[in-house]
C-alpha cells in the first residue's frame, strides 16, 4: 500500500511556510504522494449539488470563503521543494484547461522531476464554475473529459500526433519533450459513478474513488468491494484485464475519534490507531494499492 497526503489549497495552512513544512515532513516520513485539489474560481452562489456531502452543500461555501490556490502552480512549486515524493493532481477538473496546455505542463514537470508526476482526472461537478470560466457546456463535461484525456495521451505518446474530435482538433503537431515515464505519467480516474468507471477502463491506469459520496457509498469494505467487482466486470466486457487497473481510495473521513456508521457499527478509518491500521490492512487485502488522506 502506498499513501498520499493532501496539501492545503485554502484555509490557515494554505501559505508557503506551512505547505513547505507539510510537504517536506511528509517526504521524510515516507509518504509516497503529495496531492493537490483543483478549483480556479469559487462562485459566491452555488446551486450545484456537491457530491461528497450528505446534504449536497459545498463546505467551502460556509462563511463565504472563495480562497483557493491554483493547482498546476502549486504542483510546480511542490516539485521544487521536494526531492523524491510523487506528485498527484487530485483531481484535475479536466475541462478547466486546454488539453494541449495540460499535456505540455505535465510533460515538462515530469521531465524536471525525473518522473514524479501522476495525473488525476475528473469531469467536475460545479456548473457555476464552468460558466464563470467560459468552458464547453457543463452537460457535455463527460464527453469533453474523455476527449481531452485521449488527446493528452496522443501528444504524450505519438511523434507528430493528429486528433480529430468534437472538442479537440489538431494535425501533425510537435509536442516535445515527452514525459520521462513510459508510456506516460499514470492516469488516475477520479469518480464513483458508472461513467467514471467506464472512463477508467477506457483511458485510465488507476481507479480513484472518494469514499464519501453518498450516492455511491464506499464507506464500508463491503460496498467498496462491490464497486471494485463492478469495475472488473466492465473491464472484462471491454476486453481489458482487471489486474491492469490499479485501485486507489481517497479517505476523506479519517479521525482518531471513533464515529458511528449509519448501519450502527464503527465508521471505517475512525477510532484508535490499531483500528485504523486494521481497516487499512483489509483494504489492502481487497487489492487497494494506494490511499490518499
Describe every region a protein language model picked out.
Residues 1-293:
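Active-site-adjacent structural elements that line small-molecule/cofactor binding pockets in enzymes
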Amino acid at each position: 500500500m502506498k499513501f498520499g497526503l493532501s496539501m492545503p489549497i485554502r484555509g490557515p495552512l494554505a501559505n508557503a511556510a506551512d505547505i513547505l513544512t507539510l510537504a517536506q515532513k511528509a517526504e521524510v516520513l515516507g509518504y509516497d504522494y503529495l496531492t493537490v485539489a483543483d478549483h480556479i474560481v469559487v462562485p459566491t452562489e452555488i446551486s450545484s449539488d456537491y457530491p461528497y456531502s450528505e446534504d449536497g452543500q459545498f463546505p467551502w461555501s460556509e462563511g463565504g470563503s472563495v480562497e483557493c490556490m491554483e493547482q498546476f502552480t502549486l504542483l510546480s512549486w511542490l516539485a521544487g521543494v521536494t526531492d523524491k515524493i510523487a506528485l498527484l493532481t487530485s483531481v484535475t477538473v479536466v475541462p478547466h484547461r486546454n488539453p494541449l496546455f495540460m499535456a505540455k505542463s505535465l510533460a515538462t514537470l515530469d521531465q524536471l522531476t525525473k518522473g514524479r508526476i501522476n495525473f488525476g482526472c475528473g469531469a467536475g461537478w460545479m456548473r457555476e464554475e464552468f460558466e464563470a470560466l467560459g468552458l464547453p457546456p457543463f452537460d457535455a463535461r463527460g464527453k469533453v473529459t474523455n476527449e481531452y484525456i485521449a488527446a493528452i495521451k496522443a501528444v504524450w505518446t505519438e511523434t507528430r500526433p493528429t486528433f480529430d474530435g468534437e472538442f479537440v482538433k489538431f494535425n501533425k503537431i510537435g509536442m516535445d519533450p515527452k514525459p520521462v515515464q513510459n508510456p506516460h505519467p499514470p492516469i488516475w480516474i477520479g469518480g464513483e459513478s458508472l461513467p467514471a468507471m467506464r472512463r477508467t477502463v477506457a483511458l485510465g491506469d488507476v481507479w480513484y474513488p472518494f469514499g464519501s459520496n453518498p450516492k455511491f457509498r464506499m464507506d464500508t469494505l463491503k460496498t467498496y468491494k462491490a464497486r471494485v467487482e463492478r469495475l472488473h466486470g466492465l473491464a472484462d466486457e471491454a476486453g481489458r484485464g482487471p489486474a491492469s487497473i490499479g485501485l486507489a481510495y481517497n479517505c476523506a473521513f479519517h479521525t482518531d475519534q471513533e464515529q458511528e456508521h449509519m448501519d450502527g457499527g464503527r465508521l471505517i478509518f475512525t477510532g484508535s490507531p490499531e483500528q485504523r491500521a486494521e481497516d487499512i490492512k483489509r483494504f489492502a487485502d481487497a487489492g487497494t494499492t494506494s490511499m490518499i488522506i
